[in-house]
Amino acid sequence: MVLFLDGGCVSAADQDFGVDSMREYFRQEELITAKITESMDWNQICRYLEEAQAIVLTADVYLDSVSSEVLTFLERVEQAVIGGESIGAIFYAVLYTELYEGEQTSIAMEVLKNFCFRANITWGRGLGIGGNKLEMDSGKSNFWKWMGKQMVDFRLGFLQEQALFVRERIQGTDVYIHPKEVSRKEYIRKMNRRVKKNNRAKIAQN
C-alpha cells in the first residue's frame, strides 16, 4: 500500500495535479490519501503507517521548512516509533516552493531526511519543485496561459519518474527542478506584479 500524506499546497490544483500524475502508476486499492491536520484520526494514521510499503509526503516549503502542522506530525510519528511503533515503509517527498529554484526546498528536504534517520525510516527520494506559483497566476494572458501549460508538462515527467521510484520501492538521488521555459528574471518580475496587485486590492478593501 502507498500512503500519500497531504501536507498542504499553495494551490489545490497543484496538489491534485501532483497526486493525479502519480496515481496512474498504482492500482487504486494500493493508494490511500490522508491530509495532515491537527484533528486527524491518529489511530487510523498509525494503522496506515504500519501497513504502508511506501509513504509519499507532498507539502509546501515556507522559509526553508515545511509547515508547523507537518513538523508537529513528524514529531508525533517520531515519538510513536520511540514508543514501540514500527514503520517499514520507504519515505518519499514532493516539496513545492513559489520561489524560482527547486533547490530552495533542499533545506526542508534535509529536515525530512533527519526525521527519517531519527525514526529509523528508510529515505527513498525527494523531488523539489520551484516556480510553483506560475500556473495558478497565469490569469487571462494567453502568453502566461501557454507558459502555465508548459510548466505543467515540465513537471509531469518528473512527477511520473518519482512515481516509478515509489512503485518499485527504490532509493535515488534527490532532484530539484524549475520551469526552464521562463527565465528567473521574468518569473520574479511577474511575482512582483502579483504582490503589488494584491497590495492594491487590500488597500482598496480598507
Which ranges hold each PLM region?
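Helix-loop-strand module that forms the ligand-binding subsite of alpha/beta enzymes
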Residues: A12, M40-A119
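A short beta-strand-loop structural module common to alpha/beta enzyme folds
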Residues: L5, Q28-W42
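Short helix-loop-beta junction
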Residues: D20-E30, K113-T122
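Well-ordered, non-membrane alpha-helical segments in soluble/globular domains
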Residues: F17-V19, E69-V77, T105-E110, G148-Q162
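Glycine-rich phosphate/pyrophosphate-binding loop and the adjoining helix
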Residues: D20-S21, L127-N206
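Extended, charge-rich low-complexity interaction segments
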Residues: V66-V70, R118-A119, G124, G157-R167
